[in-house]
Amino acid sequence: MDTAITATAAGLPATAHFPSEPDKVRSFFDFLDAAPTTERNYTKALKRFFSWLAENGIKNPTDSHIRAYKKHLMATVKPGSVHLYLTALRLFFRWTFDQRLYPNIADHIKAPRTGRSHSRDSLTPGQAHLVLDTAKAHERDGLSGLKLYAIALLMLTGGPRCIEVSRANIADIRQADGHRVLYVQGKGHAEADRPINLTEEADAAIRAYLTARRAKPDEPLFTSDSNNNRGERMTSDAVSRTIKGLFRECGIDSPRLTAHSTRHTAATIASQSGNAIEDVSCFLGHADLSTTMIYDHAVSRTTSRCEQSVQNAIFSARY
C-alpha cells in the first residue's frame, strides 16, 4: 500500500509527504503541550523513528513500515521503551492527520503489554539505613554533603520522584496539622499540591542545608554546586546521578537500582510497616489504587504517619 493511495483514501492530497521537518515537529509539540519530561521522551522517540526511516531509505512511510518498525523495536529495546516509542508515534500521526499533513498510519498499531511489576528494585531497610548513614557522614564535607543527606533522607522517607525534588521550592514548605510539610508538583499536576510530611530528621537536614547555603525564601529547594550552573535549580538528572552515586559508594550497584528505587523503597517499607493501603496510596500520590488497590479520598495526607514509620523502620534496621 503506497502513500499516495493511503493519502487519497484518507481524504488528503495524493502528494502528501511525510512531515519530518523540524518546524513541523515543533508544531506537533506546541499542539501537544506536554510536560518537559514527556516532550524530551517523545523527542527521543521521534528521532529514533526518523533515523530508522533514513537508514532504510524510507521517505514516505506506510502502515506496513510502522509494523516493521515495531518488530525492530521489540528486538532491540525493552518492552517499556517500545510502549513509549509507539505511543509517541500514535500521537504524532494522529496530529499529522488532524492537520491534513499525512495519513494516520499508526492508529492501529498496538504496543506490547508490559508487566505489572516495577522495572526497578527497592532497597532493604538495612541497605536504606546504610545509604543514609553514608550520606550523613558527608555532612562534614560542607554544603554539598549537607545537600546530599537532605536529599537522601527526603527521598527515602517521603518517596518523591526525582522531578518532584527538582521542582520543589523553599516556599513549598509550609505548616500543616502541627508539623512541616513539603508540597511537591506531582506527575501531571500544574502546581505543587501533593503533601509530603517532613519527619523531624528530614526537616532538620533541610534546614541545616538551607542555612549553610544562606538561601532566600524565593529560591529552589535544591540548587546546583557545579561550576557551570552554580546556584541554579538542580535538575532531575542531577538528582538521579547524586543518588545513584551514593548507592555505588555503599557498594549497592545494580542496573535495577536507580534513584527511583528510593520511591519503591519508601512504598515497600510503608506497606510492610502496617500502614493502611489507602494511606500508602496517598503517600505515593497515586490518582487511584490501580497499583495499590482502591483509593479512598477520605484519607487525610497531612495526618498520615507513613513517612515517620518508614524512617523508623530504616533506622532500626541493621546493615
Name what the model sees in each region.
Residues 1-319:
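Conserved catalytic core of the tyrosine transesterase superfamily
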